Amino acid sequence: TTIMGMICSDGVLLAADSRATTGSMVAIRDMNKITDITPYIYVCHSGDAASTQALARFLKEYVNYLAVDSNSNCRISVSVCAQVLRKILQNNKEYLLAQMIVGGVDENGPQLYMVMQSGCALPRTFAAGGSGSTYITSYCDQFFREGMTIEQATEFALKAVNHATIRDGYSGGPINIVQITKETSKRTWVKPANQPLNYTIVKT
């Protein structure tokens, strides 16, 4: 798995591969690793699929409950979502295997949090996780810069995740890109044949 998130000048960009593995076997080629919590908050997940999907599902239901209970039109903050996940992981770290990136746009503007397995939620301008992230650390250090537009960030993230899928056997498949702005959010799937590094070995 390779997941990535960054704050842009006009929103938040999230990206992830779509390969799920069982040991060394590819179990799913097109798994969705970016879950919509609200129209303006999304969560990237890496780790045990059952744990991460259960966490994302619980968070979405909890946020829906808060929205109904508060009976207001105010946006749930990205920070609240990150703190909910942090608390669950902290209290259940012996049973859950998950690392998550929470990103979105709320009343405070673009926000991004890395939620660690230990139950720590850290605000970030850029975050990457999963087994594939270790292969692209230097690439991201060199080419990521703060203040990129969402389109520039999309190009950067697409290349970075593509690099990870080539080197990491546990990452691969279509690359899932989610662009989040104050007004809207947009999801795009980039198939292997359309990815920047057109190597035949990763096109299957």
What are these regions (language model features)?
Residues T1-T204:
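Long, low-complexity N-terminal extensions
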